[in-house]
């Protein structure tokens, strides 16, 4: 009550905003007469004038009235379309980074041209996002005429385009595309090895069409790029028998030598080959054709074979059947070492699982591994400014505000709505409901009134189609199976007597025009004459008037959707631009929503009345019961999205750190200093395990350190001799000496290639190592996410446990990147530039050629997370990387909130 009184006194927030926008509309209208007097060249020159103003520091808000007036005038000249005042308001809402709720038929496609033009003047690009490729291509071509007239370029990104084509599209002033394609291109850019492979140039301003569908309905599952993990079954098969020919040796700590072919480190579950073992393995690999005579395992082109050798050694010597794993249904299933339970679906990494499969003679499974992943929430929140349009956003206004900081503004219609929304009819069962729909359609179609029947599934659309065929009712069906015919079917749906069956989402973005789509009819003719066009227009006017007289488009909903928004979208197909129309939903107690949520009161009442199958009830209590059910489902789905976002925010913080550092590394010409810092860090960490900080010499394990340096980094240093020769070689000086000697050896090795080749090689090794370890980390994070809920049974908060464990895993990921990068560069043998070329060629061959871009259909939250586990020569300046966050000093607190210094946490790679 008090709120209503307050609104009467001061007006609602929406009304106050509209009042403010109308003042701008008056300014724009005042310019219309003067701008209509300008020549085409004078109007086009306004674009350069606006750009010069912006360069002088004038804000976009200041030039908005003039810019909108220019676009309106260009629309009249180029397309014969004038922006209504309400469309100007819609454009202002979008420019301010809000959601513009405009009813179907209010011309949202034309509305987008206003803020798109204004924001493109800054030169930073505008992305216009649609729900499918057809609409993206159509709108880019259609609205591109207007932008081109004003001197701006337009691009469209579509699935299947080459990198060159996409780069050109993203470099345009205004780029159209689908939500999936923008998201996948962002992920692909952050998987690129070379800067020139990237296609995007940042996230500046986005206008999302059908924003409720994209940011709400499709936000329950992440975008995933996946590919085969390590499809090298033949290598595992060839390695399998080699291991059996090796003999276990023992370490002699006094002589610092090892007998046999390998030694076992039980503590770390690792196998180390002796010099003799290396020679024997190389000889065996020559025999099976994996090496040529005289080749070394540590040659640049062969070094990756060590992974398969190590995996086979570990599979045979460290992992025992019925202790570490079992073989069940011809598959290797891991046994949890702490609980003894089977861990179905979990697989060891680094090729170990495939090696065990080869050992046991079961099929070696080709795995799909997640390469990159992001949710729509976290992708779209990267834009400096985000806006959206839809006919149905107000019901989700709270979620838009809390998740995306987007305010919903309801824009008034250009003409007063005349649609009549009739009460729902509820039947006892589906058969009675469908029979009633058929009867209604059969009667109405005789009058010449067009009908659109909306269904929630393809299956129901086909059932209704077969019933219509039996009754001899001519009709068209629009569902996913007729996607290519979508525009044609929708174009005819407003003709007199037309009957169209459509799934709820099909055809969104294309208006149903009463009398049929005049523009498409004219476009279908080859070089039509003026007389033909005049005749088509006259015929269309007759059809249009006939349909208006019959009551406009009738929309029949065959069942209620879980979301009120989807129902409102279906209703919105009728009554566009002040046209008449009528809508009604036909329901049954067998419908999913009614069966799951409708109150027993409704069901019992219908039974007591003794209603028959083909009789319907029409009552306010039924409508309220349905609305309560829909609100319950909406809350459930909102909770799912919030839960997904809460967990993904943890991954997102890590993703931002990795992608930002990766992009900075890609822009660096010379990473040698970074490599030196990584080597220093790895050696310091290694030394800490054998020479604890602050310890005395008697506590040092010098032999262990010598062995570790030799096995892990190929560094044979006589540390014991150094200590004998120099009694002043204490902990700190010893550390400095080892680091200096390691650096000198590395530089001598790299001296055989020129500096440019060396820098290129070092950067590629570092980036590929980051990518490899990031993939492993993503899969580990996914596994953690799937099972963390079990912590709840131990009275622990799963989210807090997930956050803490994820932080530990991220630190381990950074350590692995450092260690593997240093190990690869230390162990690799470089004789000349040819070896570098061989290494690069090998990496290209091992990189999956076909990566799968996948956005799973929205399911429950657990299903969504389970699913998550699953040629260009261009100027690199076109895709310049922009730092997303302020530069952090190495001694500053880490922005991730760990409490550590940046250099000791997320800055380890830099």
UniProtKB/Swiss-Prot annotation:
It catalyses: ATP + H2O + cellular proteinSide 1 = ADP + phosphate + cellular proteinSide 2. It is an enzyme of class 7 (translocase). Zn(2+) binds at residues 894, 896, 905-906. Residues 880-890 have a biased composition (Basic and acidic residues). It is a peripheral membrane protein. May bind 1 zinc ion per subunit. One of its GO terms (cellular component) is cytosol. One of its GO terms (biological process) is intracellular protein transmembrane transport. It is found in: Cell inner membrane; Cytoplasm. GO terms for molecular function: ATP binding; metal ion binding; protein-exporting ATPase activity. Its EC number is 7.4.2.8. Transmembrane segments: none annotated. Its cofactor is Zn(2+). ATP binds at residues 87, 105-109, 511. Residues 860-910 are annotated as: Disordered. The keyword Metal-binding applies. Part of the Sec protein translocase complex. Interacts with the SecYEG preprotein conducting channel. Has a central role in coupling the hydrolysis of ATP to the transfer of proteins into and across the cell membrane, serving both as a receptor for the preprotein-SecB complex and as an ATP-driven molecular motor driving the stepwise translocation of polypeptide chains across the membrane. Belongs to the SecA family. Monomer and homodimer. Part of the essential Sec protein translocation apparatus which comprises SecA, SecYEG and auxiliary proteins SecDF-YajC and YidC. This is Protein translocase subunit SecA. The gene is secA.
